[in-house]
Amino acid sequence: MAVTADVKGTAILRNKVADYLNTEPGGESPAYHLMNVFETIDENPNAQVVEKHYTSDKAATKLTSGYAPQFPITGDQYLDNDVSEFIRDIAEEQQSGVETDFIRVRLYQPIASKENTFYARKFRVSVEVSSITGAGGEIISQEGNLNQIGDVVIGEFNTQTKTFTEAAAAPASAEPSGT
């Protein structure tokens, strides 16, 4: 057996993950725009855990039963930026129940033989705007969350045509075989 040295691998910088938001959720076709005026777009999987203490064990067992993902966002407000204006209008007009699609693209994971196409995940999200702030001389800032609704969809995204294509087959789950 060959022995390999442990290596760190290649660091993934934040600009290698692109985020797109559909700014016309009621339109005939999605209008995905790059979220390019946002300083942070974090991903909090928020694993939901069930704890059981079985009679035959001294220690409790914790099982991950699901997720409640949330994407905290902080960005600047710009004129003529579709994402910024979409979020501004939700807050200023006090729109409730706004749902849209959010796509997270791994620019470091291209799809073989498909130009400008990368591994991506699509999330249905509700848009929660918690604040629009700005002191004198500052760019107005928008903060809030994109709260996931339902399950993530795995697929690929073409950054030139801005189209998402769902993967042909869902990845196999880690279910026990029962044998």
What is the role of each PLM region?
Residues 11-20, 148-163:
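Short secondary-structure transition/capping segments
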Residues 96-101, 148-154, 169-173:
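Glycine-rich loops and low-complexity Gly/Arg-rich segments
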Residues 58-122, 157:
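Extracellular/virion structural assembly segments
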Residues 90-96, 122-126, 146-148, 164-168:
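Short, low-complexity, polar/charged sequence segments that are solvent-exposed and flexible
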Residues 156-179:
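Intrinsically disordered, low-complexity terminal/linker regions enriched in Pro/Ser/Gly
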Residues 2-74, 78, 127-140:
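Solvent-exposed edge beta-strands and adjacent loop segments
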Residues 105-152:
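Short beta-strand and beta-hairpin "edge-sheet" elements
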